[in-house]
Amino acid sequence: TMQAGLNEYLLYGGLPQILMYNTEEQKVRFLKTLFDETYIKDIKDRYNIRKDDDLEELINIIASNIGALTSPNKLANTFRSEKKSAVSYDTIKNYIDFLSDSFLVEKATRYDIKGKHYIDSPFKYYFMDLGLRNARINFRQNERTHLMENLVYNELRTRSFNVDVGSVSSVGTNSEGKRLRSTLEVDFVCNLGSRRYYIQSAYRMPSEEKLEQERASLLRI
């Protein structure tokens, strides 16, 4: 069924070789081996990385937080506060560049829709294959909402769209009459030539409240 196909894709990704394997064990083994013995080994060899603990931990953090706003500075702070490791901004940035150059992850930059300019930081990082992402964290943290967002991003990139993360601000008043500025996120601002689309990604719309929540930022554009 279509739902079964979607579930399979969200779990094992879209690499063609996956179709050669019939059992879950075979698919998991293939993805883990490909990630560790091909992608990561190539990165370590190509960039002569000898002390690889920080690289490995960075991959885990990004894989565990797909679709979350972050930056090299924020990641460096995470290493200092949670991992007790003083990894510099430059090292984090270099490692992320290595992952991007190896087609493991891709960065989506924030774009101020009303101001018509890019926002320097933070960004979002998406895995270019969900199966590799899931294999990296041992198929834990399979929240459908985040996986669907990553899937939609990948599909838009496959269709040659340039994809940014939208930010839209508005000014309103609270119950006391005070002016308040709020910022809402548009999941994707997609551009291809003269075409532009604004997209919200949601795995489920279980209620009218959820629908209104997803529409709120679009209605402010």
Regions picked out by a protein language model, each given a short descriptive name:
Residues 2-5, 22-27, 206-207:
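Alpha-helix capping and helix-coil boundary motifs
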Residues 1, 156-158, 218-221:
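Alpha-helix C-terminal capping segments
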Residues 203-221:
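Catalytic cores of nucleic-acid endonucleases
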